Amino acid sequence: MVVLGSTGSIGKNALKIAKKFGVEIEALSCGKNIALINEQIKVFKPKKVAILDPNDLNDLEPLGAKVFVGLEGIDAMIEECVSNLVLNAIVGVAGLKASFKSLQRNKKLALANKESLVSAGHLLDISQITPVDSEHFGLWALLQNKTLKPKSLIISASGGAFRDTPLELIAIQNAQNALKHPNWSMGSKITIDSASMVNKLFEILETYWLFGASLKIDALIERSSIVHALVEFEDNSIIAHLASADMQLPISYAIDPKLASLNASIKPLDLYALSAIKFEPISMERYTLWRYKDLLLENPKLGVVLNASNEVAIEKFLDKEIAFGGLIQTISQALELYAKMPFKLSSLDEVLALDREVRERFKNVARV
């Protein structure tokens, strides 16, 4: 298999599972963590390696692997790979082209890069995609029951770092506080997305593309991150998917469903410790961006705008140019503006052009 973004949280877990399952690693890619990819090269001995920055070439120790550089290099590497499976764990819209290239080459795509579906779900062959996250894995597992007819799909949110912060203090919070996730240890972008509830807006759009636009789609807060998804059926019964909060479960099924079903990759749940499970609505007062959920489901191509404005705002937030309120305001302004504009987005080039336009328009965000 090919692992793109091998030095991130998902990538590292994917390599653990690959080693456990005896899956050969043909190629690896990383962004800036050259020290870690050097270690991974020693262990997994890939035939190909891609890095983002040519300035890092001197520090790379490829041990005979063919080296590719930049986003174009990742595309070229995928083109040459013979593996049937690509796991795309690149962060941000940078992973979009890699998803397209993988599907063009008729590869199965284990997709952890949310932005691919959020920005271009209408252009991707969903039949070749396995989502790598707990919520969509939970939905997939629940929808294996073909006797019951689903009516609504519900995914869970932890509530993120500011779920108990006094409302009047949320807008002035900084990145350091946003990165204190109560349940998970993840990369900085997804942790901030969890605090803003953008992550759940992404997952709502992913659900739309993956499991059908005809069903009602919603989310709720479940603080323990043990209930990952629920499906309500036409008979008004509801089935929930519960599992330990561990990404190795969805990753293992994305790599090899048969082996995953026979080998436990996570700890068993202690059912007697589950008395704390409680469902709460997502408050629009606390998570103001949640008010755009219905707008996005009515016009899912706005996902490009959501993602581009979010990436611009997060960069400024991490650089201490804006506080959390400025991040929320940037995304709100972008969605309000582009909701009034018609656009078709009938090709990848058009998606990337709109992505660039939104970034350009919102890169000079005033300090808030």
Swiss-Prot record:
InterPro entries for this protein: DXP_reductoisomerase (IPR003821), DXP_reductoisomerase_C (IPR013644), DXP_reductoisomerase_N (IPR013512), DXPR_C (IPR026877), DXPR_C_sf (IPR036169), NAD(P)-bd_dom_sf (IPR036291)
Names of the cofactor(s): Mg(2+); Mn(2+)
Gene3D superfamilies: 1.10.1740.10, NAD(P)-binding Rossmann-like Domain
GO molecular function annotation: 1-deoxy-D-xylulose-5-phosphate reductoisomerase activity; manganese ion binding; NADPH binding
Entry binding sites for NADPH: T7, G8, S9, I10, G31, K32, N33, N113, E115, G187
Catalysed reactions, as listed in the record: 2-C-methyl-D-erythritol 4-phosphate + NADP(+) = 1-deoxy-D-xylulose 5-phosphate + NADPH + H(+)
Record-given protein name: 1-deoxy-D-xylulose 5-phosphate reductoisomerase
